[in-house]
Regions:
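Catalytic cores of nucleotide-sugar-dependent glycosyltransferases that transfer UDP/GDP/TDP-activated
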Residues: 1-265
Length: 266
């Protein structure tokens, strides 16, 4: 099949460090190529893939300080896809609801995997307006707020079975927090849990620009405690040792998590 994978432009595919959606897009794209499909990946220009890469922006938006309006590059991306949509058997979007107005007016089959939370009230009229746009959930629980959507199925996230190899020689000595620092991930709760358990906590997490004030005002003052070590972002190669050295992963979320990729990594 001639398949187009359309990724968000916030991170490279795969991400250099943190990034859930873009990593899943990479795993799926590489697997489809291995199966013999003709795959084109629409993504940032610093992406690395065995598929054909169509760069919709020179580099990941998070690494491009010149971009202040992230919607503008994504509008360019959609136009880029629209111009060649007829060349594909199917288009697979990972851009939430952004492609709905465009694709509802084109003839090429398409599907959108929804990677984010769906309980926000403002999403209801969007999905009411596009009742025939086919969508895929990443867990059955994720889709509950939008029963009216055109659900094509649920496809859980997965990982390559050789991606993370446990390191039995590493002695587990600490609790781990892995992911992103933002209010809904509740790293502050993880710090309290570690203190109450008497175990040290290592935090491997990124801080987005949108969460910089939250980090500085709420989280940074908590990092002075003796049992807390803030590592920052880590890449795929660093994860096996980080997770193997942990007695447990703390995941004290305070939001309707669509899936939770870090849990299956652990």
């Amino acid at each position: 099949m001639r398949i187009a994978q359309i990724a968000p432009l916030y991170e490279a595919v795969p991400p250099k460090l943190y990034g859930g959606t873009e990593r899943v897009v990479s795993y799926l794209t590489e697997a489809l190529v291995e199966l013999g499909h003709d795959v084109t990946l629409f993504a940032s220009g610093d992406s690395v893939t065995s598929a054909r890469l169509e760069a919709a922006w020179p580099r990941a938006l998070r690494l491009d300080p010149s971009v202040r309006d992230s919607m503008a590059p994504h509008m360019r991306l959609l136009e880029q896809v629209a111009r060649v949509a007829h060349e594909f058997d199917v288009l697979h979007f990972h851009l939430d609801y952004l492609p709905f107005p465009l694709m509802s007016r084109l003839d090429t089959p398409y599907v959108t995997t929804l990677h984010g939370r769906l309980d926000l009230p403002e999403l209801q009229p969007v999905f009411d307006a596009f009742p025939d746009s086919p969508v895929v959930s990443i867990s059955n629980n994720q889709r509950k707020p939008l029963p009216q959507a055109a659900w094509a199925g649920t496809v859980y996230h997965g990982l390559p079975d050789t991606l993370l190899t446990p390191q039995p020689d590493v002695k587990p000595e600490y609790l781990a927090f892995l992911g992103r620092i933002c209010p809904e991930k509740r790293v502050d709760t993880a710090i309290r849990i570690a203190a109450q358990s008497g175990l040290p906590l290592k935090i491997a997490a990124k801080v987005d620009k949108a969460d910089a004030d939250y980090f500085k005002e709420v989280i940074e003052p908590l990092l002075d405690q003796a049992h807390v070590e803030f590592i920052g972002e880590i890449n795929e190669a660093q994860k096996p040792a980080f997770l193997s050295g942990a007695k447990a992963l703390l995941f004290p979320i305070d939001w309707p998590e669509p899936f939770g990729l870090v849990m299956i990594e652990a």
